[in-house]
Amino acid sequence: SPHAHAKIKSIDTSAAMNMPGVVGVLTGQQLVDDKIGNLICGWAITSKDGTGMKMGAWPAMAPETVRFVGQAVAVVIAETKNQARDAAEAVVVNYEELPAAADIRAAIKPGAPQLHPEAPGNVIYDWTIGEEAATDAAFKSAANVVSLDITNNRLVPNAMEPRAAIAEYNEPEE
């Protein structure tokens, strides 16, 4: 998707399906219709108030709404990589743009565009790590304290945590 937040109004795959070497074109809605499951969260986190994560489904491709630039909405399967790339260019997606928040501070302000209905205020979880009393004591006894605001957009606290899907087709044995 070229949009940060948008409803998918339609996806026309007909031109792509008729291109040389194309085996198929799948959309996020087809995955839902075929009851293909969602990607899972590898590490569920409890918020500091004890509640669980307020996270909805995480599909491999967006079925109805895109929530970040670059979110997949369709995939082309073809005999060669170049054929797949050419056919992908022929997929036509009609979007209805929705309001988006471009940074974390804007996303959590009252009245900000809501991205996930399961996460009020755009907060999936709110957590802390470490010992609050020991940290407070260290600051109180420090000779100098420096304050710095740092923004980590879409932070994943892992060295590598790809959200991906892969498929391999094997012809049935006869």
Where are each of the predicted segments found?
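Charged, often Cys/His-bearing segments associated with DNA-binding zinc-finger transcription factors
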Residues: 125-133
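Conserved beta-alpha junction segments in alpha/beta enzyme cores
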Residues: 134-174
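Flexible, low-hydrophobicity surface segments
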Residues: 1-126, 145-148
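Short, charged beta->alpha transition segments
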Residues: 54-64, 132-134, 153, 163
